[in-house]
């Protein structure tokens, strides 16, 4: 009962805050707020420089592999259970998936900086 009440109150509070921010936007914009700022001078180059798509793909690949490696961190505690064979099998499956995905990424030249 307490959990349901807390979830209901949190949901209502979030909806109330979203409604308030939607109906009461900041309407007064000044030219100083919309101008770019670079040490008090006008910027010498555009602020929105394009970044390399190759860098973006390598960064996303790193995040995916990092997340998958983080799944292996509780492995020493999981091996202390009464049935460690299931834990070993699941961890070996995860490591196999990691190796296969790394081999696929390497074969598709997803880790190369230059073309």
From Swiss-Prot:
Q: How does it sit in the membrane?
A: Multi-pass membrane protein
In its UniProt entry, what is this protein called? NADH-ubiquinone oxidoreductase chain 3
Indicate the family of this protein.
Belongs to the complex I subunit 3 family.
Q: What is its main location?
A: mitochondrion
Q: Name one GO cellular component term.
A: NADH dehydrogenase complex
> Could you describe the subunit structure of this protein?
Core subunit of respiratory chain NADH dehydrogenase (Complex I) which is composed of 45 different subunits. Interacts with TMEM186. Interacts with TMEM242.
Can you supply a Gene Ontology BP term from the record?
mitochondrial electron transport, NADH to ubiquinone
Q: Which reaction does it catalyse?
A: a ubiquinone + NADH + 5 H(+)(in) = a ubiquinol + NAD(+) + 4 H(+)(out)
């Amino acid at each position: 009962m307490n959990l349901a009440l807390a979830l209901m109150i949190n949901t209502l509070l979030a909806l109330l805050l979203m409604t308030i921010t939607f109906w009461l936007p900041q309407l007064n914009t000044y030219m100083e707020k919309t101008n770019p700022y670079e040490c008090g001078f006008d910027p010498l180059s555009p602020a929105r420089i394009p970044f390399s798509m190759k860098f973006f793909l390598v960064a996303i690949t790193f995040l995916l592999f990092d997340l998958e490696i983080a799944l292996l961190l509780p492995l020493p505690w999981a091996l202390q259970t009464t049935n460690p064979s299931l834990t070993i099998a699941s961890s070996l499956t995860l490591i196999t998936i990691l190796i296969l995905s790394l081999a696929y990424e390497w074969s598709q030249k997803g880790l190369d900086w230059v073309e």
